[in-house]
UniProtKB/Swiss-Prot annotation:
This is Transposase InsD for insertion element IS2A. The keyword Cell inner membrane does not apply. It comes from the Bacteria. Residues 106-289 form the Integrase catalytic domain. Keywords: DNA recombination, DNA-binding, Transposable element, Transposition. Gene3D superfamilies: Ribonuclease H-like superfamily/Ribonuclease H. GO terms for molecular function: DNA binding. PANTHER family: TRANSPOSASE INSC FOR INSERTION ELEMENT IS2A-RELATED. Involved in the transposition of the insertion sequence IS2. It holds the Pfam family HTH_21. The gene is insD1. One of its GO terms (biological process) is DNA integration.
Amino acid sequence: MDSARALIARGWGVSLVSRCLRVSRAQLHVILRRTDDWMDGRRSRHTDDTDVLLRIHHVIGELPTYGYRRVWALLRRQAELDGMPAINAKRVYRIMRQNALLLERKPAVPPSKRAHTGRVAVKESNQRWCSDGFEFCCDNGERLRVTFALDCCDREALHWAVTTGGFNSETVQDVMLGAVERRFGNDLPSSPVEWLTDNGSCYRANETRQFARMLGLEPKNTAVRSPESNGIAESFVKTIKRDYISIMPKPDGLTAAKNLAEAFEHYNEWHPHSALGYRSPREYLRQRACNGLSDNRCLEI
């Protein structure tokens, strides 16, 4: 704009300058009519971020692995409970960046040569459940193995079991039964629910598959060497290890199991999930039930 003003001052026409420099002719006319003592009255709005910063510190003090999006989701939820205006996610990002509170960027992961074109998530609850297992080590060297079941729509951890033994059919059957009781009480599903798992022996055992069909579940196995086909369960393992197991006290197996129960409860009640509009699984379910909406419409709110 300064170059345009200089050219016009030398005698060049306003239309020619605006066309050649691709600047607004109307804006040039406004600038040329300004007096010498003109001052820009616009000022950037000053915001006091002290209170927001304190709340951010409170969140990351308890959950140090949370990035700015999940911090924003928890602040938004608290603001809704208090009847206050929600905080913008960009403001949370700016404050955390200015105070060096952002997480380090993840290293770039080379894309897989094996494309996965299927979709694990479903549009309604109780259409497909997925299951998997993981293990972790306590400070005293004791190893715990966890088996769990998730809903592939609302991401709620339906049931889980922990043991010092291996992954076996009996544990999987306990998780199946607990998941059905969680969603249907003493009844069985009116239509079969897909039970998506990998090809572990505890899932492919005849006893497991027969028990699943007795409960109204339809066993489905992923393709061989295709962990992406059970991506929701794989992502949950990464989440539970990063956000909970890595920071919780686990001096021995008993203490770790008690803290793991609190971790699963916190995940269901508080953990913001990007696929749910950064709502927790149970928060999403309550919102859907309160509004009487389907899963698709609920995600749009």
